[in-house]
Amino acid sequence: MDTDYEAVVYDLDGTLVHLAVDWAVVATDVIEVYDEAGVDARGADLWGLMERADDHGIASEVEAAISEHEHAGAHDSRRLPLADELLDRSVPVGVCSLNCERACRIALDSHDLAAAIEAVVGRDSVDTHKPDPEPLLATVSQLGVEPSEAVFVGDSPRDGTTAERAGVDFRRV
């Protein structure tokens, strides 16, 4: 793949590592933030709650609740086989994740991957998050290449949508 692209960008959780996060517990904690603000959060999923938090003036509290779990889960994360692939890259490598940037960096450090990564963009690094193209475009820009010169490697339909919207080739794992 190195000969086909000038840069490779990876998603983090589910692609390079598996964060030890119980997302159901995270959702419960986020719903508690909504409850404390007097906002009905019934029926919404975690990412919907995250997206609506700003509308209710609780974005920083919701982000803190999610990030706390991600930080702990990054320390206890499990390295996935694809992580070995990035260490052999001869082109610039970045990470673009829906996780917060600090959790990404913790996980990369925990698995001795940080030195191989030239750019890390998490959901809190830019104003929008995947599937908006902005985070991936920011990562590609930090790597010094054009979107058409990069490939995004991820594990979810959201990653594929992000790549398509950014004009970046996609490889699903």
What are the roles of these predicted feature ranges?
Residues 153, 166-173:
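C-terminal binding/interaction regions
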Residues 2-3, 89-91, 143-146:
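Glycine-rich phosphate-binding loop signature in dinucleotide/nucleotide-binding domains
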